Amino acid sequence: MTTIRGDDLSNQITQISGSSSKKEEEKKKQQMLTGVLGLQPTMANHPVLGVFLPKYAKQNGGNVDKTAFRLDLIRMLALHRLNTKTGSD
């Protein structure tokens, strides 16, 4: 029988809980993307969504104003587009 030191055991617990929390975070992001924002999962690769989706998912407390999130996303997409157009001129 192998003895597991306390440090090893706590590292194993951290790895297990870390992977489950990552799965929960991904699930929240997908739910926010499709349920609240009404977007296709393929849009998750957009640079603006890559930045704001984790923030949106953390703010999502269940009872949210979908319109407010959508308007904020449209504003961010417009700013991104404006910055990329002026940067290339």
From Swiss-Prot:
Residues 1-31 are annotated as: Disordered. It is found in: Virion; Host nucleus. InterPro entries: HV_small_capsid. The gene is SCP. It comes from Human herpesvirus 6B (strain Z29) (HHV-6 variant B). This is Small capsomere-interacting protein. The keyword Protein biosynthesis does not apply. Interacts with the major capsid protein/MCP. One of its GO terms (cellular component) is viral capsid. Its main location: virion. The keyword Transmembrane helix does not apply. Keywords: Capsid protein, Host nucleus, Virion. Participates in the assembly of the infectious particles by decorating the outer surface of the capsid shell and thus forming a layer between the capsid and the tegument. Complexes composed of the major capsid protein and small capsomere-interacting protein/SCP assemble together in the host cytoplasm and are translocated to the nucleus, where they accumulate and participate in capsid assembly. Belongs to the herpesviridae small capsomere-interacting protein family. It comes from the Viruses. GO terms for biological process: viral process. Residues 9-18 have a biased composition (Polar residues).
